[in-house]
């Protein structure tokens, strides 16, 4: 995926490959709870000494999914985080800590729709596109996956 190109459109200045992390974030759709979750996440990010680069709405095609999936579909965003001077191992460890702290903070909040908050992936190495989808639906649901600039060393689809 050419995130550099996508992020330039949003005025997000991404560093070189491997120098930033991408987080896939599932957020509540109702009211302003998505912004509340983002705020919690950003606070924890700062507390852990990490730098937020920006947020991106993940483009999806809701016509590619069934009615049950539509009824429980979260708001899906990507967050970009600068690696700065951390080693890859230090960075990945910090990202893991941020993810766990954010999950706990949202779970302990008073938000009504906190169950929608989920972080499928937060890493400088791996991005997980996940959903209540059949294998044949994932490529058409997530527009990133059908983008001509999308490149991956490995793609794996798991279906229950």
Model-based region annotation:
Residues 1-160:
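N-terminal segments that mediate ammonia production and transfer
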């Amino acid at each position: 995926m050419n995130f550099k190109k996508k992020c330039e459109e949003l005025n997000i200045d991404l560093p070189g490959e491997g120098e930033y992390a991408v987080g896939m974030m599932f957020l509540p759709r109702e009211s302003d709870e998505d912004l509340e979750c983002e705020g919690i996440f950003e606070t924890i990010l700062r507390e852990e000494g990490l730098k937020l680069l920006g947020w991106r709405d993940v483009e999806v095609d809701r016509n590619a999914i069934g009615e049950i999936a539509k009824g429980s579909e979260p708001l899906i965003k990507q967050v970009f985080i600068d690696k700065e001077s951390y080693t890859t191992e230090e960075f990945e460890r910090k990202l893991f800590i941020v993810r766990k702290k954010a999950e706990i903070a949202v779970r302990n909040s008073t938000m009504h729709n906190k169950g929608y908050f989920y972080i499928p992936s937060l890493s400088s190495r791996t991005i997980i596109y996940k959903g209540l989808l059949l294998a044949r639906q994932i490529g058409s649901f997530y527009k990133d996956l059908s983008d001509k600039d999308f490149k991956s060393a490995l793609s794996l689809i798991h279906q229950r």
